[in-house]
Amino acid sequence: MILISGYCLLVYSVILPVLISASKLCDLAELQRLNKNLKVDTESLPKYQWIAGQLEQNCMTADPASENMSDVIQLANQIYYKIGLIQLSNDQHLRAINTFEKIVFNETYKGSFGKLAEKRLQELYVDFGMWDKVHQKDDQYAKYLSLNETIRNKISSKDVSVEEDISELLRITPYDVNVLSTHIDVLFHKLAEEIDVSLAAAIILDYETILDKHLASLSIDTRLSIHYVISVLQTFVLNSDASFNIRKCLSIDMDYDKCKKLSLTISKLNKVNPSKRQILDPATYAFENKKFRSWDRIIEFYLKDKKPFITPMKILNKDTNFKNNYFFLEEIIKQLIEDVQLSRPLAKNLFEDPPITDGFVKPKSYYHTDYLVYIDSILCQASSMSPDVKRAKLAAPFCKKSLRHSLTLETWKHYQDAKSEQKPLPETVLSDVWNSNPHLLMYMVNSILNKSRSKPHSQFKKQLYDQINKFFQDNGLSESTNPYVMKNFRLLQKQLQTYKEHKHRNFNQQYFQQQQQQQQHQRHQAPPAAPNYDPKKDYYKILGVSPSASSKEIRKAYLNLTKKYHPDKIKANHNDKQESIHETMSQINEAYETLSDDDKRKEYDLSRSNPRRNTFPQGPRQNNMFKNPGSGFPFGNGFKMNFGL
């Protein structure tokens, strides 16, 4: 074994110098062959870098004036250019600048790749604000100088409108770290006035640009601070997922205290809250809602628990008067946002921020961040889903609060008009609110339907009901597994049925009024006629009741028949003629008018039992023995009267 090992060592010691010597040889043809077989992609980058290293170490040491040197430099420039393109595609712009500069700074031989690299470099110099390296300073440069002067003047005079000028400057030089940091500073100053989603999103975008384009030039502390700031704004202002930046922060330094505390806080809240899909995704809300059953626990956690969910000293670095976890969370959010405002990495605090009161910055909008509105929405949904009446009542006020801060002013006005005046909503309102927060739309619908119960029926009201009903049908909500959705659907159907019954009653009243007007008109034209009952007409049969039916049974039968032969049925039933249905309706009304009146009903019953009793068209015949409807004397022409004369 020792002999074999010794032999191998002897052979290796002989071959190694040969390998080292071979590696120092410039095999240009082999390097050119390798270059042709490679794609311009990230996977090929290490191979391009190896070829570039071979060229630099073994091939570019010869006399620059030698004949073979031009081929070496041409290959090197091609390799550098491809490396630069791959670096650009990976957002490594500063590295790409260094790579392209290797081509341009070689004065001996540039070739076509030298021109391409020069063009790329000039564009990158402008993007990064390296104006001292730009060859042709055109109108764009003049505008850059003008904007710079305007920005300096506005900053010195504390004019916050400078944000518009900085934004315009970033359109010229989007990756200039000095311009980006100035923009961040102005945005933070505005955020101290009002916690606004668009401002927070703009700050995050600027910091992400700096991380993407200037990562290599940033210190570890700066990178940690940036990831922390982005995480706070994403979580508690934008209500978006910050897990990527928290992981980045802790991967750089797992003991970084701010990111550790933030991660712990978010983790504890996520254990209580339902998933965002269950709250914000319409399909999950409507058809998978039964998967979450801890609605009572949510109300308990935020509004009833007597202990904070995390030790105040851990997250706030101070004690606080604890009322419940909802108000405690408000304090945490204020503290965290204040912290990122004060730290604002890379920014210089060029403006004087609003005064701090009671340890916190001015704006009341701390209470209206997207995250807190989201928590309000969770509590609202919990109030609708909880079987415990007391808990539900405790959480109910958060519905109106969440809705007020979720809707735009215009949409809020439309919602109020729908509630108070039953005005139909604009076409997009129902779908827009549904797609952003489905439970809030169901709360809106419930409020509108309950409010409209006491309102008079109108065409507007019918249009509003039809609009809501169409939305339910279009989205398949009649099949929802969410009990609150189904509660609203049943309430809507009940309201629609009430409206239909009201419409039927109105029609019948109008019909009776017309009949009464006609009768009054006839009475004015001719002497009133005595009741005329045709025993051939069976009013009981027409109404479908027995002769012993009560008044209540007669009325019920009548209402059912009026629904059946309502004018709306005329259009729906193509087999019956319009005149026939009107005739049927006339008989129904005639029968009901007689049988619903006790006196008329008695008279009708008597006429049916004694048909001859009702044979006189003008009422009962008067007992006048001297009146003969025929010709002559009523006792016959041969009858002789004897008056005792």
UniProtKB/Swiss-Prot annotation:
Residues 1-22 form the signal peptide. It is a single-pass type IV membrane protein. Residues 597-606 have a biased composition (Basic and acidic residues). Residues 607-625 have a biased composition (Polar residues). Residues 23-190 are cytoplasmic. Gene3D superfamilies: DnaJ domain. Residues 538-608 form the J domain. Acts as a DnaJ-like chaperone required for nuclear membrane fusion during mating. It is found in: Endoplasmic reticulum membrane; Nucleus membrane. Residues 212-645 are lumenal. Pfam families: DnaJ. GO terms for biological process: ERAD pathway; karyogamy involved in conjugation with cellular fusion; protein folding in endoplasmic reticulum. Residues 511-536, 595-631 are annotated as: Disordered. Present with 3180 molecules/cell in log phase SD medium. This is DnaJ-like chaperone JEM1. Interacts with MPS3. PROSITE patterns: DNAJ_2. Residues 511-520 have a biased composition (Low complexity). The gene is JEM1. The chain crosses the membrane at residues 191-211. One of its GO terms (cellular component) is nuclear outer membrane-endoplasmic reticulum membrane network. Keywords: Chaperone, Endoplasmic reticulum, Membrane, Nucleus, Signal, Transmembrane, Transmembrane helix. InterPro entries: DnaJ_C3_Co-chaperones (IPR051727), DnaJ_domain (IPR001623), J_dom_sf (IPR036869). GO terms for molecular function: misfolded protein binding; protein-folding chaperone binding; unfolded protein binding.
